[in-house]
Amino acid sequence: KEAPDRVRELEQWGAVFDRTPKNLINQRNFGGHTFPRLAHVGDATGLEIIRTLQERGIHEGIDIFMEYTVRHLLKEGDRVTGCVAYTRVDGDFHAFSAKSVVLATGGITRVWSVCSGSWEYTGDGHALALWAGAELRDMEFVQFHPTGMVWPPSVRGILVTEGVRGEGGRLTNSEGSRFMFDYVPEMFAGDHAETIEEADQWVEEVVSGKLATVRRPPELLTRDVVAKAINSEVKAGRGSPHGGAFLDISHRGEEAILKKLPSMHHQFKELAGVDISKEPMEVGPTAHYVMGGVLVDAETQESTVSGLFACGEVASGLHGANRLGGNSLSDLIVFGKRAGEFAAKRASDLAQPTIDDSQVQTAIQEMLAPFTNEGGENPGIIYDLSLIHISEPTRQHW
């Protein structure tokens, strides 16, 4: 109910969403969706939202502390009263007093060697909440996106947007077969095309701005189904040369691709030397999103610890066990706003808490401990050994 208002608010703040010829916000198809629901900015919607919110933050005069890592949450009794952090540039320590704290730290997918998340997706927010006494739930629910880059090794796992399939991208195996027709679960059988002709007609109707009169291609099944299908094809010996599947959008033509998928065109050209307007991409499953996280109140986003709020991927409860594509951004803009509003409302009734020096010193000692330990493991050696294991043939498949 609130997502449309948040999209309009982003537009008022300067976001530029794609428009239809009738000047309505264009909405794209994603896997698992019954209707085209996704307001988008080409294939870089997230970046546009980040840009817009950063500029808004500067306009509002919000203090932004760049390149800080929070290591410890301060508490007074059962409530959170601030945090201790260090700067990644020079290692200085800083303590912050806060009436309310909002965690918006993202996910945990850097736990996997093949993942789509940034280097910061190391579960810091989940750990901070747990150490502060907050309850976590559903941490076993991790989603693997079906289309990450697979070659060269340096870019393995980088996301290939679902928008490619939403714009008509075709998944094929090494034999040239559109294998997704063989993997439609019984519960989805009536919702997806049974023939290539029907699937292609759906694409023609949708890309021309019409309402589809036929069923959607099986490439737009939910992420778990498509990821498992690609994995099955690879294990059966029908994978691409580097252990994935082929995703082809070249039939849409260069003009349409540069208009609708400019970031993907640039990404493959620069990172893999592949022109997606002329040749297929190689893609495979990549760790993408954790549905589990901090248990929060559905209305306020407050955790089980007073004064500690969470929103986005670090929170839980919104996406069940298998998030649909695009819903993470709706989650962010709706519940991010809610978390901020309720955190501010709570803070307005409280006095500024005093920083507990003993807690700060304990946090600093914990941060410095790895530099003073005698014995233990050398993380550099462990990392090198992990690369050796990953390079073995048995570990090249997901």
Task: Map each language-model feature to its residues.
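Conserved FAD-binding subdomain of flavin-dependent enzymes
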Residues: 1-16, 134-137, 142
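Glycine- and aromatic-enriched mobile tails/lids
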Residues: 9, 15-39, 76-78, 172-192, ...
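An anion/pyrophosphate-binding glycine-rich loop and adjacent beta-alpha core
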Residues: 135-270, 274, 342-348
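Core beta-strand elements of the Rossmann-like FAD/NAD(P) dinucleotide-binding domain
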Residues: 91-100, 304
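A glycine-rich dinucleotide-binding beta-alpha-beta segment and adjacent secondary-structure elements
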Residues: 71-80, 84-86, 259-315
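Conserved redox-cofactor binding core of oxidoreductases
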Residues: 6-92, 104, 148-152, 157
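Glycine-rich loop(s) and the adjacent beta-strand/alpha-helix scaffold that form part
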Residues: 100-158, 322-342
